[in-house]
Each structure stands twice: as C-alpha cells, then as structure tokens.
C-alpha cells in the first residue's frame, strides 16, 4: 500500500471519480445554508439532501465531494479513543438514480487496490454485507473474486434513520495485522467487531427503499448510491500509524503543543488525552468560526464555547494556564490550506475571537471554584456527598471539569454522586442522539414535480408581462387537465415574468388570465427540475392545460422589490467597508415594503458605525450609478472582483450585478437600472439574532420618506411639549431638564445618606477586629443600588484603615460592595471577598483587590453571606 499524505488521498479520490464521470461538489460551509433541520453539516450527504429527495436535479447524476463536517453528539469520548473527532472530512461518491451496486462496488475496489490510486493489498481487505443482500454478495464473490470467508454477513448493515430513503450497506475493512488489537476481546476480533486490527475504511449505502410514515418500505423509483470514507481514518491506514492523531493532519499541531507545554506526546497516557482533545477541538473551532459561527450561550455558539472550554481545561493538565489555543490557528491553516484557504484568509479574526474566549474562561474557572466551595459546605452539613445534579450543572453550565470537582471533593473528605452525574450525562447524550437522527431524515421524493421535465423560461429580467402557454396544472398533489373557480392550484408556463422566491428575494405576485379565466398568483417557487412553479387561486372560470394566457406581474410591488434588492447589495458593501472583511451575509429578506439583512459580526454596531453605513449607501444612491448586469463564466466574474455570497453554490455561468466600483456581486435577483431609482435609504433597526449574527432592517424610497415624515411629526410634538420654537432649541431644553433632574437627584442622595447615617448610628462602634484586621461587615438600608456605593464612599472616608463589606436588599435584589485598604491587598483582596459571598445570595461578582461589587437574587441569605465572610476572613 502507498504511504500518502492526507492531501494526496483527498486529491486522488476526487480525481478517480472525475475520471468515472462524476461532478465535484465543493465542500459546503459547516453552517448549513437554507436548512434549519441541521445545527451543523454533519456528513458528506448532508449538503446533497436536495438532490436525493427530489427538490433539485443536479447537473450530473454522479457526484463526488470531500465535505468538512462537525459532529458533537459524543464530545466526552474525544481524546480518549483513537478515532473520535468533532471535526472530520468525509470523502464520498454519490449516484442520483444513475449507477447502483455493481458500479459502486467495482469503483471502490478499483480505487483501493489499483497501484494508480491507493495500492492496497487485496488480500488485506474484508467486507460486510446485510444477510439478505444477495446482490451485493454475488458482486463481491463472483465479480470481484473475494473469498467467501472474507465476506461477513451482519444484521446491522442496513442504513435507516427514519422516514425517507433507506437501504442495505456494505462496509470495507483493512486488516492492519496481528500487531494491532492484541488487547481487544477475542470475540470482537473480526471485521465489523470492536477492535483495532480490522479498520473500516469505506461504507457504501445502497439507497433503494423509502421508509414510509406507516413504517412500511417501498422501492424508490430512482435508486441512489451514498458512500462515505473518513479521510482521517484512511490517512492513518495509509501512513501506518496507530491512531488518526498521529497522521500529518494532526502531528504539526501536536508539535506546537509540545513547544508551548514542554511536555511530549505519546509518553504519558493521561497527557496524551489532553493533546488529542486540544488538537481535535482547535480544528473544529477554527473551521466553524471561519464559516461564520461565533461562541455564544446557545445553538452553534454554545457548541463552540463548550469545545473551547473543554480544550482549555485539558490544557491545564499539561501545565498551560494562560490563553494559547489561538496560537494554534496558523498551524491548522497551514495544514488545510491547499483545499481550504478560508481559515488562512480569516486567521487574524479567528485568533482574536478565540483569545477573547480563552481569557473569559480563565475567569469562569475562578467562578466555578467559588460555587464548588458552596457545594462542599452544603455537603459537609448534610450527606458528605456532592449532589450529582449540582456537579452536572457545574460541568455543563459553567464548564467546570468533573475530574476537578472529584479531586477537590476528595481533598475535602467528600465524594461526588457520580451515579446521578452519569445519569444526567446519559440523558444529554440521548437528547443529542435523537436530535441528530431527527435532523438527518430526508423528505420522501416528490414524484409528480420530479417527473415534469418540460422547460419553463423566466423572462422577467426584461419585462413584467408575457403572452405564454399554461403547460401543467397540479391540484391536490396530482397533475390534472382542468381546475374550477375558487380552487387553489399550482401551474407552470412556457415563459413567465414571475420571479420565483430565491436568494432572499420574495416572489412576484400578479395575475394570469385570458377571456375565460383568471388566476391570482400569490407564490412562485422553483420546481425540482428548475421550472418556476406558480401558486394561485382561480378567481373565475375554468382553467385548462394548454390555454394561451397573459401573465402580468404587480408592477408597483416589483419596483419596490427592485429598489430594496439593489439597496441590499449597497448595504453589504458598506458593512464590509465600515466593519471589516469578516462581514458575510448570513441571510436576507427583500420584500416590497422593507429589506432585512443578516450578517456575521461579533458585537452590536455603534451609532457612529450605523450612521457611517447609512451615509455610504445614500452617497452611492445619489451618485446615480448605472447598474450593469451581465452573464459570464464564474472565473471571469471573480477576476473582475465580483463578490460571491458566503456558502452559496454557483454554476459555471453566473449573473453579475455591477454597481462599480462600490459593489460587484453575483446575484440572480431583480434590480434597478440606476442607483438613483432607489431614492433614499434609511436604517430603522440593528439587533442581534443569535450567536455572532446581527440584523439590519431598512427602508428605501417612499417607505423611507414616510418613516422620516413620521419621525418629524413626533419631533414637532416634542418641540411643542417642551415649549420651544426652533429645532435647535430642543437639545438645549432637554439638556437643561436633565441638569435640573441631576441636581434634584443629588439632593435626594444627600438626604438618603443622612437618613442612613442616622439609622446606622456611630459606625466606628460597629467595627470588629477579625484575625488582626479591622472589619466592618453590615447590611445597610438604602433606596437603590447606587446609594450603597455612595454609602460606602462615606464610610471609607471615616474608616480609612478598615476592611468594609456592605450588603443591601433593594426591590428583592441583593447589592453588595467591598473595599480593602491598599496597604492590606497583598493579604486580603476585595474581589475574592465578593466572589466568596455572591454565590450564597444566588449571584456573582468581582473586581479589583481594593474595590469590588456583586449582586444576587436571594436577599433572604444576606445574613448568611455576611456571617460566612467573617469566618472566611478569620481563616485567612
């Protein structure tokens, strides 16, 4: 067998199947495009669902890809095994109703055994099949010539994830020899068993049945092939190394970790786990961020945050106690660059995000210790065991390692209820597994639409009307020849001016009619074979297939949609100009009355940034730039600087919407002929929609004017209420009122201080000596959170050499503040005091050594927290 680099295996695989007539499908972004059923792209076939379920027809029925993927259903196993990963590449060849078992098996055998390709020894290959799949057996045995002893029948060789395509599969195994798997159970020592000797290198799925809702199976009209070969695993076989982590995909990362930590890989098993966790997770994190995901507290962002925190935790076992993961990004970029240049292009941004997250997590670890200390106190007072649910919450919510929880508990003479902890973990795994199974199921093929292949030409770029012929009617899921008045119907036209919903732009509406009937068109979508599929209600008459009709788009709405779509392009370019090149479109909606644009960015825009973007767009509108639209090949388009939307798939010929030099973008939508037609652009809101995604909503033309007119009316009302005559006086009047309010609040604050002082009496008498320190620990009665700080300032001026800790209950919320004289901060730190107290009142806090503050939601525990902090100081 040849010893090949991973990049060579990938290229050979693609080249082989191109020779066999396959079309290369580029690797899609990890963040799914137009697929809400998936959190991540999690397999090679995930991006091809649209072809398998019949929604779209590919240019070629034979497809090959190398697809990056993320799976996080068993994160806790990564690092402890030889081949578990959260990020991996899946090589796959697919047939959509073209070749089937015979060719799929022959292709696989040729690629693996031919000296031109992988050059594997035929006598080291074994296969598994489903017991009832005699067709696969005969191909392997009679055509390939594989001995019967090397064909293993396994009941589990049937690919079925619920409703949708399913079928038997055959897996190919490579025998690595007796040196591997010596510690594995004898009963598992066979291809398909749990062992290290026989490694699965390829899985061929023969998708020939539909799994129906009633759990019956019916033959698919078009049989499909779906195969998967893990690149990391194949690299480990080709390079003859024990685990995936010793391949050239990982070893440069391991070498860098060795430099940073001073530890060696493959010397200590416990440390090796940390090496593998870090190496795996940094690949996932770097690629996910490069594809538009950002750390957050939910969804994809939560997965990233969890992975990063897990890697940081394990790095501490290597003695790394400072941010360093971000330094590995360049290594990942160099390894993957030949096929995935995106990580290198965005490396600076990725490093910035990761470093910020690392710094935050080092602070989180401190918070976790404070919570754990409370759990230890609670356990000592009750069962001498830390509750498993509490330990799981500490692990799952705060990212605190269960191993560290156990270690600290043992040192305190306690144990952790691991049975309950493991139960909680298993429930989480089950939820993730179920979600994965649900998300991977495909739709049942739509045969009615799929079988309609007659052409339907879109002519709406140049006109809003057309004389055309009605070619197909679909009613209640069946193709019919006529439909009566009042019914909802789907139909196709030989030529149509109606734009189908696509690229964020809504569909046109309008009417299709002749002397005998009229249909009000409400929706237009793309059929599987690319035709525009119209939906409408028959207003009067009887609709017949073959009728000659007039098709008219609602031109008022069309003009407004054009304005908003062209403005969206200008907005995208302006955002990149103001915020940076990391901005990518994450979604858009172009309607007649407004536009909405989602984009990747890691924080809210400032008012100044919003103003800059708005000004840039309007300047381009007022310049009156001609909008030139051309069709050209994709290479020429990119050479002229056309921006391709992130994650969008394009054909060989593309449509370029050119508003040069400001915006040049690939787009199939409808646009104005000159930017001056947009008239006016106004941003009305900027908000967050999720992890690292911001949303701008904006208006153009008449809608923008009416919006500003409404604001002007409200401004005039405010001017009247303030009793000023000119616009310029409004700000002065508001400033005057604010100054008067501040003066009144200051008077109230002083009065509150005086009242508090009277209530407290002589505070010097309340100072205690604890462990050699002068300490004032007390609850104060104040009207608001701000007042506790002013009270502290007052006390500090009188007790300059005293540690002061104050707590208050304001509206059932706890506020607390601590100060420590600077001369004492080497021994006592205000931040530590608050961190110890805050969890007791159900909150958190921190700050500097000399000043800190915090809060909580359990005012009933204020007395308990004050007593605790006295004991804490006593034991310093």
Swiss-Prot record:
<dbReference type="InterPro" id="IPR009000">
    <property type="entry name" value="Transl_B-barrel_sf"/>
</dbReference>
<dbReference type="GO" id="GO:0006419">
    <property type="term" value="P:alanyl-tRNA aminoacylation"/>
</dbReference>
<feature type="binding site">
    <location>
        <position position="671"/>
    </location>
    <ligand>
        <name>Zn(2+)</name>
    </ligand>
</feature>
<dbReference type="GO" id="GO:0008270">
    <property type="term" value="F:zinc ion binding"/>
</dbReference>
<keyword id="KW-0963">Cytoplasm</keyword>
<comment type="function">
    <text>Catalyzes the attachment of alanine to tRNA(Ala) in a two-step reaction: alanine is first activated by ATP to form Ala-AMP and then transferred to the acceptor end of tRNA(Ala). Also edits incorrectly charged Ser-tRNA(Ala) and Gly-tRNA(Ala) via its editing domain.</text>
</comment>
<dbReference type="GO" id="GO:0005524">
    <property type="term" value="F:ATP binding"/>
</dbReference>
<dbReference type="InterPro" id="IPR045864">
    <property type="entry name" value="aa-tRNA-synth_II/BPL/LPL"/>
</dbReference>
<dbReference type="InterPro" id="IPR018163">
    <property type="entry name" value="Thr/Ala-tRNA-synth_IIc_edit"/>
</dbReference>
<dbReference type="InterPro" id="IPR003156">
    <property type="entry name" value="DHHA1_dom"/>
</dbReference>
<dbReference type="InterPro" id="IPR002318">
    <property type="entry name" value="Ala-tRNA-lgiase_IIc"/>
</dbReference>
<dbReference type="Pfam" id="PF07973">
    <property type="entry name" value="tRNA_SAD"/>
</dbReference>
<dbReference type="GO" id="GO:0016740">
    <property type="term" value="F:transferase activity"/>
</dbReference>
<keyword id="KW-0030">Aminoacyl-tRNA synthetase</keyword>
<feature type="binding site">
    <location>
        <position position="569"/>
    </location>
    <ligand>
        <name>Zn(2+)</name>
    </ligand>
</feature>
<dbReference type="InterPro" id="IPR018165">
    <property type="entry name" value="Ala-tRNA-synth_IIc_core"/>
</dbReference>
<keyword id="KW-0820">tRNA-binding</keyword>
<keyword id="KW-0648">Protein biosynthesis</keyword>
<dbReference type="InterPro" id="IPR012947">
    <property type="entry name" value="tRNA_SAD"/>
</dbReference>
<keyword id="KW-0694">RNA-binding</keyword>
<protein>
    <recommendedName>
        <fullName>Alanine--tRNA ligase</fullName>
        <ecNumber>6.1.1.7</ecNumber>
    </recommendedName>
</protein>
<comment type="similarity">
    <text>Belongs to the class-II aminoacyl-tRNA synthetase family.</text>
</comment>
<dbReference type="GO" id="GO:0140096">
    <property type="term" value="F:catalytic activity, acting on a protein"/>
</dbReference>
<dbReference type="GO" id="GO:0000049">
    <property type="term" value="F:tRNA binding"/>
</dbReference>
<dbReference type="Pfam" id="PF02272">
    <property type="entry name" value="DHHA1"/>
</dbReference>
<keyword id="KW-0479">Metal-binding</keyword>
<keyword id="KW-0547">Nucleotide-binding</keyword>
<dbReference type="InterPro" id="IPR018162">
    <property type="entry name" value="Ala-tRNA-ligase_IIc_anticod-bd"/>
</dbReference>
<dbReference type="InterPro" id="IPR050058">
    <property type="entry name" value="Ala-tRNA_ligase"/>
</dbReference>
<dbReference type="InterPro" id="IPR023033">
    <property type="entry name" value="Ala_tRNA_ligase_euk/bac"/>
</dbReference>
<dbReference type="InterPro" id="IPR018164">
    <property type="entry name" value="Ala-tRNA-synth_IIc_N"/>
</dbReference>
<dbReference type="GO" id="GO:0002161">
    <property type="term" value="F:aminoacyl-tRNA deacylase activity"/>
</dbReference>
<dbReference type="Pfam" id="PF01411">
    <property type="entry name" value="tRNA-synt_2c"/>
</dbReference>
<keyword id="KW-0067">ATP-binding</keyword>
<feature type="binding site">
    <location>
        <position position="667"/>
    </location>
    <ligand>
        <name>Zn(2+)</name>
    </ligand>
</feature>
<dbReference type="GO" id="GO:0005829">
    <property type="term" value="C:cytosol"/>
</dbReference>
<keyword id="KW-0436">Ligase</keyword>
<dbReference type="GO" id="GO:0004813">
    <property type="term" value="F:alanine-tRNA ligase activity"/>
</dbReference>
<feature type="binding site">
    <location>
        <position position="565"/>
    </location>
    <ligand>
        <name>Zn(2+)</name>
    </ligand>
</feature>
<keyword id="KW-0862">Zinc</keyword>
